[in-house]
Amino acid sequence: MPMLREAAADLRAEARRTNERRLLVLAGERTAGHRAAEAAISAGGISRESVVAVGSGDGTHFETVPVTRTDSILGTTQAAIVLDCHEACRPNALGRMVGAVDGGGLLVLVVPPLDEWAHRRDDFDEYLAVPPATVEDVDGRFRTRIVRTLRQHRGIAVYDVDAQALQDNGLTDPAPRPAPPPIEVPAGSDFPSAAYDACLTRDQADALRSLEALSTDENGVVIEADRGRGKSSVAGLAAGSFAVAGEDVLVTAPSYRSARAVFARANELCSTLDMLSNDEGESGARVLRTAAGGRVRFERPPAAATLPDSPDVVLVDEAAALPVRVHESFLEAPRVAFTTTVHGYEGAGRGFDVRFRDRLAASEHTVHDVHMGEPIRYAPGDPVEVWAFRALLLDARGAVDPLVSDATPTEASYRARSADELVADEHLLRETFGLLVAAHYRTEPNDLARLLDAPNISVRALLVDGHVVSVALLSREGGLDAETRSAVYEGSRIRGNMIPDVLMSQLRDEAAGEPVGVRVMRIATHAAARNRGFGSRLLAEIRSDVEGVDWLGTGYGATPQLLRFWARNGYGAIHLSTTRNETSGEYSVVMLDPLTDAGERLHARHASWFAARVGHQMHDVLRDVDPDVVRAVLRAVDADPPMDLSRRQWRLVVGAAYGPALYSADPGPFSRLAITHLVSGDPGVLTPREERLLVCKVLQGHSVETVANRLDYPGTSAAMRALGDPYRPLVDAYAPSDVLDERDRYGS
């Protein structure tokens, strides 16, 4: 393979000279592709120890990582990565590998013949084939896009291993770049000079300087960056600087793995300054202590939101992954910093900007904004990054604000956009995907492939003057045959049928998989056009438009605001998860909007079951759900809970409301009456505080001390006295006439 060896050597030499990466595509038969990869790596002067192969490992002599474990490579850098795309072309894996190649390195793709690739079905296509669809129903539009962009972009060499022909050498012949100026320690810095010495770019040094604002209270810092800019590292340098000054730094992130870079840099700085107090300063530990008495510690978001031990500084890494409710808790800290990824390989974070900025600006913190654009591992303008951003739509954005800022729902046109239409119109595709990226942190490259190729996925949108203002991603679910339903009921997993799966496996309703439904996976409205009714208009259009469907549904992390939105649009709650989401700390709710008799029957029985069981769950697995979430969930249940109180139980409730009887004598009837009111009663009968009291004390059974503290009663006696107040109007509204004489005895 002399032609390949020469091309690989030239490609690697240019990559090293420019501190950029280059991409080498080896197209053709798989075994020949692996041989070509080894030859190219050798010709490029890269040692085997500096290479990771991603795939099954067959035919290679490099360290191998399964394609399903590419998350283990995040945060590492390699001189070369060989990604085998024959068994599966997984978009997330592709994006992650782009981010893991160091400047001067090579990303090698071993792929089928380019003209055939899109027409082949692989393991990822099996993943997209959601039952009852099969892999033959999956399309190849995403791989068609990959092939087209590989052929169009600079810095990408293409070699046909079957014909042993070089189709493109991938060389760009760039002009030499001037050396960047040295990084200097700013005058008057509060941080150690060693922290600035550890910065790799001017952007990092500027961000570190901004983080010095956290030396005084009532300051906040927001750092936004594309992936690979070193924002987590600079947060770690700041954390270490505060810790060596004796301060307590609380770090939180979606997972500890996400925050490893923070702890690694903090550990390195403290070691350089000889300030580590013990062996807990290892980068894998969750607490780092310094000789000055300071520390850097990690807590998961739900625990961190309580600000345990009153930290001096809070650092929130990958903030866009967390809900606004959690961020609001962090604003109680005197000093807080948020870092967030704008264009990421496993999720993007403009939603943080959309959802939280107003609250941050209204807080008592002076906010310092920082944007980091300079890569730390390769040169700016790196052609492989440019290709990945375009091919995977990592930089997709909605229309610029002025184009939609005056739009109204009445002037919008409704469109059902097919995948072929999206592929044919790059502008429309970028705006559509950009809105999903902006509104949902976990929108990732796999979602682009799902949007283009999955047979159960469809898109609906509202457009104004040709620009996407609101978009919904829909997933067709259900319609499962008896054999599949039986398997799921007995414990088998099923892809892509979230609502039928929950109803069949968790709630033991085997028949729930038979009706056909459409789940609204995601709905997003342009930030400049929110709170005007676009989302409601879009849902109404979808309801009128879908055919052959028994129900519409949705599932999401429950908040009072979202619950009210979906309930206003006709969706009723039928299930609340019994565990919190580990990242967001929220409980997930499932809601249905029935469209046919079959859908009505499904909705009616699950709404009734939910209303019947939720009171018991509140005393157990749902005991720590926020009272306002409970109120909103129950208000969204379309059912009539049974009010089967005996005459003696009614006399107890009436006597506690109007006379000397005690709630503690038998809490059961009080709970059933509370459920009835919260599900089907007039919401104007009780104040929000009175309803919270019912939830906290009567349904969840918290101690009177906890209730008094949470609801701001002056003491436990006041809280217990207040418990009688909401039951008076409830007795008046629900008690049968033959027990009202009990009320009349006390001069009501």
Whereabouts are the PLM-identified features?
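Inter-Walker segment of RecA-like/P-loop motor cores
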Residues: 57-79, 254-305
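N-terminal accessory nucleic-acid engagement/regulatory domains that precede
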Residues: 71-81, 85-178
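Conserved coupling/interface region of RecA-like P-loop/ASCE motor cores
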Residues: 133-202, 206, 358-401
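Hydrophobic positions on the alpha1 helix immediately C-terminal to the Walker A/P-loop
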Residues: 36, 234, 238, 538
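Conserved beta-hairpin
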Residues: 446, 456-474, 479
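Terminal substrate-recognition subdomain of acyl/acetyltransferases
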Residues: 267, 271-292, 302, 313, ...
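N-terminal pre-P-loop "Q-motif" helix
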Residues: 2-11, 196-219, 689
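Conserved RecA-like ASCE ATPase "motif II neighborhood" in helicase/translocase motors
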Residues: 62-96, 292-332
